[in-house]
Amino acid sequence: VTYARNYTDVDDKIIARSHETGIPADKYAAMMIDKINAVMKRADVDDPTLWLKATENIGNIISFIQGLIDGGHAYPAANGDVYFDVDSFPAYGQLSGRSKEDSLDGVRVENDEEKKNAYDFALWKAAKPGEIAWDSPWGRGRPGWHIECSAMNRAAFGDQIDIHGGGRDLVFPHHENEIAQSEALTGKRFAKYWTHNGLIKVNGQKMSKSLGNSLLLDDLLDKYSSDALKFALLSGNYRNDINITDDLFPSAEAHLVRFYTLIDRAEKAFPNETGKEAEIDRRFDAAMEDDFNTALALSDLFGYFKEVARLLDANDPKARRITNHIRETYALLGLFKKDPAKYLAAYGEKEADVPAEVKAVAEERFAARKAKDWAKSDELREKLKSLGYAVKDSKDGYALEKI
């Protein structure tokens, strides 16, 4: 798979932040890109095959726009802007099922007098004083957001791409506009498949700066392993919204500690066993072919590791064959790539400070829950709180957190 990550490193928001901070737009964008790349590295996210920046594709963008003008799909305005003629593309709305007029909902339309129609969108924006700009056949200016993505994609992949990803909030108008631009120019289907991920909520509320509930990846990685974050995020369908609750990441970490413990035991018990179990591949492939059903793939892990525990107790080397295959296959999701001993040592250091009394109460409460003695369980939860600890339950265990 050739995977490209697009950086639209010149747009209205970057220019606005440049004016607010006094940092030149190109330097501000470079600083943000460096921050993104650094936190992705810390989260053990694989690098893309291609890193695409709009500012490194200005020539491609200008050529793309000129092609649209030549084909009758775009027009230059007297003020130096260039607009896409939405009426020239009858298939507009094919992805979202929405109309061109919908793009005007709640939007302040600028330069109406320069457009044929209010819903036409900018491909090139004439330079304003103090803005970053490039020379073009229509005067100095900069590209619009939508054309940046279309032109970069075409430069990297040609006229068609297999899979295009992005947030659900980008379906309209951004991805709709990408389709219109690209298919108007080439006459070919732009993308074969679209994978739109859901939005992030925190305790049921949309995550936003205004609500003060924003979570930064760097801050989460100070508390949890990258495996735990991936496990939590992959536990639901990517198309659905994900609700980050107080117990989401602690529960994921608790599962991973159990899994890594069994991997560590299997590797120490059978150091020379290199075989694998093909059934894991079959089930994993079936899950991925079901619209990247990572939730199903992760749910299989509980059964696999239950079997590993049973086999270890029976001193059966098949335990190692299963963990070998789990590590190889689930590495495709970024999981189980860490050294088990190092992972457990890091987590163990956090657990080492938990007093014996607290651990004993937690174990007693866990036993009460298994016996469905809910009154006793609630009583012991309150006792843990009085000792300074919160307990986060999961299907297979619990995790303790200092209050």
Regions found by a protein language model. Give the residues of each.
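Surface-exposed helix-capping loop/turn segments at secondary-structure junctions
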Residues: R42-T49, A74-Y75, Q160, R265-T274
